[in-house]
Design a protein with these regions (language model features):
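N-terminal glycine/serine-rich phosphate-binding loop of ATP-dependent small-molecule kinases
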Residues: 1-98, 110, 114, 126, ...
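Active-site core segments that coordinate phosphate-bearing ligands/cofactors
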Residues: 2, 7-8, 109, 116-129, ...
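Short secondary-structure junction motifs
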Residues: 15, 71-74, 206, 333, ...
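Residue-level signal for inorganic ion chemistry
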Residues: 25, 48, 77, 105, ...
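Structural signal for short hydrophobic segments within the conserved structured cores
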Residues: 29-33, 209, 358
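Short, acidic/turn-prone active-site loops that include or flank metal/cofactor-
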Residues: 33, 101-108, 265-267
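A generic structural motif
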Residues: 34, 102-103, 284, 299
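Short beta-strand-loop/turn "lid" adjacent to the catalytic site in phosphate-handling enzymes
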Residues: 65-103, 128-137, 166-187, 210-213, ...
Length: 411
């Protein structure tokens, strides 16, 4: 039988997803299983790798059952996943922590502050092309070293979420450069682990898995897992990449000069460039096809529309209805202007910025209010584009994705 299907896995923050995709990129079957995000205390965010694996098995079984002869038709497996979640495993491949810190875990703020006080930011920026931040795995390891030294002592390898799933599938340990580019441990020029940054942060270099290209075959599907799923042992499992770099690839943002606007809860603006842009105003992520994504994240985004829907309609109207109401106001919303900083703003000079309406008049109605909210987010994106550092050209094409791309008015 022809092997004409590909099994895709996404280790998301909200859940585990699997899909069967044909050679033309059509999704023939899809399955999703939610998993818990654990918040032991304010600022912490954890998940159990065991839950990811359970979700992987369950969703793979589900999609295989939806397509005729699917197990015999699968040609290869590839995973992507949430970035920065730091899984330490021991010699036997067991996580040394039952629950691991995720990308949105803020417990590492003291470690970042201590590092900056000790080493500054200039040298790390020059090597990694990124500023120190609580999300980066380097500082998660620093926190574990200080607070859970026994877990670090038992560990032999650091993996990211999709890498741990890959390990369970193949028994092979590896990371990929897209994940490593946002670890604060990789030299952006050589695209290899940096001994200097490991020493500066206090990360044991021996923990860092070999870096493999996303399109490389990591290994074959383990016989035990294959038997459990009804798949062929030895099926090629690719290295894969982080979820956001994969999303850029999937949306066709693949060459220097292109841009991406992913507006969901927040807005992530990414411009592709041949080289990283070493500037404290931006972050840099390597894409699966080897181009650098110069990115900035705006706290303002779909969350502003969500707030307006709740505040003005008590969530009784759909997002489509809210957008339709906004179409009844003229461009400029009758002189009404909205600053969308409902939870502060990362790129503003003052991070305690707050949202405000300017220009309210007696005749201002819901249409103007909703249009002003949409336009306020767009103006924030434009501000980022207008203040790009020297050396960064304006994009010749921007591809919009996520929830914001569903609104014709917003686009």
């Amino acid at each position: 039988m022809t092997r004409d299907l590909y099994l895709a896995i996404d280790v998301g923050t909200g859940g585990l997803r699997s899909a069967l995709v044909d050679r033309n990129g059509r999704i023939l079957a899809f399955s999703h299983q939610e998993h818990e995000q654990i918040v032991p205390q304010f600022g912490w965010s954890e998940q159990r790798p065991a839950d990811w694996w359970a979700g992987t098995l369950a969703t793979i079984r589900a999609v295989l059952a939806k397509v005729e002869d699917a197990p015999a038709r699968v040609a290869a497996i590839c995973a992507c996943g949430q970035m920065h979640g730091s899984v330490l495993i021991d010699d036997d491949g067991r996580p040394t922590l039952d629950a691991v810190p995720l990308w949105n875990d803020k417990r590492t703020v003291p470690q970042v502050e201590a590092y900056v006080a000790r080493a500054g930011t200039a040298r790390g920026l020059e090597i990694s092309a990124n500023m120190p931040a609580p999300a980066w795995p380097a500082f998660k390891l620093a926190w574990i070293a200080e607070n859970r030294p026994e877990a670090l002592a038992r560990a032999t390898t650091l993996l990211m979420p999709k890498d741990w799933i890959n390990y369970k599938l193949t028994g092979e340990r590896a990371q990929d450069p897209t994940e490593a580019s946002l670890s604060y441990l990789m030299d952006w020029r050589s695209r290899t682990w940096s001994d200097e940054l490991c020493d500066a942060v206090g990360v044991p270099r021996a923990l860092l898995a070999p870096l493999r290209a996303p399109g490389d075959v990591l290994g074959g599907l383990e016989p035990g897992v294959a038997a459990e799923l009804g798949l062929a042992a030895g099926l090629p499992v690719l290295v894969g990449a982080g979820d956001y770099p994969m999303a850029l690839l999937g949306s066709g943002v693949i060459r220097s000069g292109m841009g991406s606007d992913v507006t969901g809860t927040s807005s992530i603006i990414t411009l592709l460039h041949d080289d990283a842009l070493v500037d404290p105003q931006v972050s840099n992520v390597l894409t699966p096809n080897g181009v650098w994504g110069v990115m900035t994240l705006l706290e303002a985004g779909g969350d502003a529309v969500r707030w307006a829907r709740r505040a003005f309609h008590d969530n009784r109207r759909s997002y489509e209805e809210v957008a339709e109401i906004a179409t009844h106001a003229p461009p400029g919303a009758g002189g009404l202007f909205f600053l969308p900083y409902l939870s502060g703003e990362r790129v503003a000079e003052k991070r305690n910025s707050r949202a405000q309406f300017f220009g309210l008049k007696a005749e201002t109605g819901l249409a103007e209010l909703h249009r002003a909210v949409l336009e306020g987010v767009v103006f924030s994106v434009r501000r980022v584009l207008d203040t790009l550092p020297d050396g960064m050209a304006r994009p010749d094409r921007i591809v919009a994705a996520s929830g914001g791309a569903k609104s014709a008015l917003w686009l």
